[in-house]
Amino acid sequence: MSDNVPTIAAVATAPGRGGVGVIRISGKNLLPMAEALCGKTPKPRVATYADFTDADGQAIDSGLLLFFAAPASFTGEDVIELQGHGGPVVMDMLLNRCLELGARLAEPGEFTKRAFLNDKLDLAQAEGVADLIDASSRSAARLALRSLKGDFSRRIHGLVEDLITLRMLVEATLDFPEEDIDFLEAADARGKLDGLRRAVDDVLANAQQGAILREGLNVVLVGAPNVGKSSLLNALAGDEVAIVTDIAGTTRDAVRERILIDGVPVHIVDTAGLRETDDVVERIGIERSRKAVSEADVALVLVDPREGVNDKTRAILDALPPELKRIEIHSKSDLHAHAAGGFGTGAETVIALSAKTGDGLDALKRTLLREAGWQGEGEGLFLARTRHVNALKAAQEELSLAALCGNHQIELFAEHLRLAQVACGEITGEFTADDLLGVIFSRFCIGK
């Protein structure tokens, strides 16, 4: 990083009241600031108890000051942490004192961004910080910690090292074109490429599982009015999150709920009827429902077996994207017998279900996990993001193209290897555009 980097400060603990509140400061040569804050010269990595004072020497609070000298800190710069009482007024006064002493307010994720830019973390590890904070289940937290501790990064670095080794082998032959084929055959370049492809496939499979655990499955409930969509949402959520009445059209807006199935987040939207209406409020809800449908991975199509697919249901089905996966739900199975087979909704799976008794809910949950592609938490998994999966798919594609190169296409072979390396490097931040970094770190919380 440049030497002209400003000192930054932020509250590092959650907003609101608490037993302890933490102010984090990062920059260069922070000892004078530490002395101004507490009237003492702190020793690195030693907790110093002191009064934190304002510009007039009046105590704002008392607590612990921790000083971490560069480069042995989270950000790689000098870092100060003030641990005081966790009231919002006290935290605000302490933060303002830091700003008076020359710091500026940190942007979201700026501490972690500095850690990345100072080579304390790679990009996958930095994302692991945010994913650990945002984890929605114990499984997600465990896998995010693995990413933060470098499990994912080590797999990627191993791929990159093997790619570099193979590239050096292939590119060296370009200087001796008359011997290239024999040289590559003797070095088993094709065998090494096959091994690389298998390794990428393995990391990709793990990354896809990690992405499922982080990002989950988007599900929409669709069907004719009063067919039981809201009742099913309540049954899945285990709570009254949607109003249930016998009046058709009760749901005038999309109702959203997140549930966990074996640690996998499932984002469910109970759609307002996908129909035309003159009601302004209902029309807004229908537009939101259409947006939810466009973003969905799976549609649960609710059908009353006594009526089958009526005109209203058919109109809803026609409004669904043809490629959207569908599960046909025969609702209210406690009131009538389950109809054999489906009703031509385009679904491969049909489940009879009663939201009232719970019959069929477990079968539906298992089906949703299968649709998500979740295979269960196993050894070697780590939390991953869609961008990681896409980068690994790009590397996989480049290696497949390299495998198609003939014996006299050495330059093309080498280029595909280079592009595969670039794709892998995007995961750890070795090859990453500044605008992508801005997007990634802007989604962190302030103070991290």
Swiss-Prot record:
Molecular function as annotated in GO: GTP binding; GTPase activity; metal ion binding
Record's cofactor remark: Binds 1 potassium ion per subunit.
InterPro entries: G_TrmE, GTP-bd, GTP-bd_TrmE_N, GTPase_MnmE, MnmE_dom2, MnmE_helical, P-loop_NTPase, Small_GTP-bd
Entry keywords, A to Z: Cytoplasm, GTP-binding, Hydrolase, Magnesium, Metal-binding, Nucleotide-binding, Potassium, tRNA processing
HAMAP family: GTPase_MnmE (MF_00379)
Enzyme type, top EC level: hydrolase
Binding site residues for GTP: 226-231, 245-251, 270-273
Source species of the chain: Neisseria meningitidis serogroup C / serotype 2a (strain ATCC 700532 / DSM 15464 / FAM18)
Subunit structure: Homodimer. Heterotetramer of two MnmE and two MnmG subunits.
PANTHER family hit by this protein: TRNA MODIFICATION GTPASE GTPBP3, TRNA MODIFICATION GTPASE GTPBP3, MITOCHONDRIAL
Subcellular location field: Cytoplasm
Gene coding for it: mnmE
Name the UniProt record assigns to this protein: tRNA modification GTPase MnmE
Domain TrmE-type G: residue ranges: 216-373
Binding positions ((6S)-5-formyl-5,6,7,8-tetrahydrofolate): R24, E81, K120, K448
Predominant location: cytoplasm
Residues the entry annotates as binding Mg(2+): S230, T251
